[in-house]
Amino acid sequence: MLSQIRTLITILKHTFTRADTVEYPEQKPYLSPRYRGRIVLTRDPDGEERCVACNLCSVACPVDCISVVKTEKEDGRWEAESFTINFSRCIMCGFCEEACPTHAIQLTPDVEMAEYDRQNLVFEKEHLLISGPGKYHDYNFYKVSGKAINGKGKGEAHNEQSPINVRSLLP
């Protein structure tokens, strides 16, 4: 009898408390500024695509949802001919963003990607590219990478030191 009364008191107490759930379409839940959502491809400050098609993002992806096909431009740089992400498989882990050496891949707090057809969740490079630099405004990979381009040798680019002779470090 005592346990039944205790149960009834607990039920009545929870009946008049405020609900913890949020009615999603009407009230948007708070998402932190660092929330990992949809993936975008950014451009450097000059307006060029940052992706150099190194395939590190597709190797780092635990569910294998990123596919990159690369080509080589006239000046010797690599670029992504096609960059495909299957968001129906993506778990938004952020490993691709961490693996990207050029900061081309960035995760945004956009989470509303619901679709009726699964094929609509396969995004190509044209859908992923944004016009701005994203989080890293002044970063330009080819100004700090050490790759010889357009007649400049290694160590002659902006803010770059000349290469170290590895043989001089040997005992």
Curated annotation (Swiss-Prot):
Q: How does it sit in the membrane?
A: Peripheral membrane protein
Keywords, alphabetical:
4Fe-4S, Cell inner membrane, Cell membrane, Iron, Iron-sulfur, Membrane, Metal-binding, NAD, Quinone, Repeat, Translocase, Ubiquinone
Any one GO molecular function term: iron ion binding
Q: Which residues bind [4Fe-4S] cluster 1?
A: C51, C54, C57, C100
Q: Which residues does [4Fe-4S] cluster 2 bind?
A: C61, C90, C93, C96
Cofactor mode of binding and number, as noted: Binds 2 [4Fe-4S] clusters per subunit.
Q: What is its main location?
A: membrane
Domain 4Fe-4S ferredoxin-type, by residue range, is: 41-71, 81-110
Q: Which GO terms describe its biological process?
A: aerobic respiration
EC number(s): the record gives: 7.1.1.-
> What subcellular compartments does it reside in?
Cell inner membrane
GO CC entries? plasma membrane
- Catalysed reactions, semicolon-separated: a quinone + NADH + 5 H(+)(in) = a quinol + NAD(+) + 4 H(+)(out)
Catalytic EC class = translocase
Necessary cofactors:
[4Fe-4S] cluster
Pfam families tied to this protein: Fer4_7
What PROSITE patterns is this protein classified in?
A: 4FE4S_FER_1, 4FE4S_FER_2
Under the subunit heading, UniProt states:
NDH-1 is composed of 13 different subunits. Subunits NuoA, H, J, K, L, M, N constitute the membrane sector of the complex.
Q: What does this protein do?
A: NDH-1 shuttles electrons from NADH, via FMN and iron-sulfur (Fe-S) centers, to quinones in the respiratory chain. The immediate electron acceptor for the enzyme in this species is believed to be ubiquinone. Couples the redox reaction to proton translocation (for every two electrons transferred, four hydrogen ions are translocated across the cytoplasmic membrane), and thus conserves the redox energy in a proton gradient.
Protein family according to the UniProt entry? Belongs to the complex I 23 kDa subunit family.
The molecule here is called NADH-quinone oxidoreductase subunit I
Which species does the entry assign this protein to? Answer: Shewanella woodyi (strain ATCC 51908 / MS32)
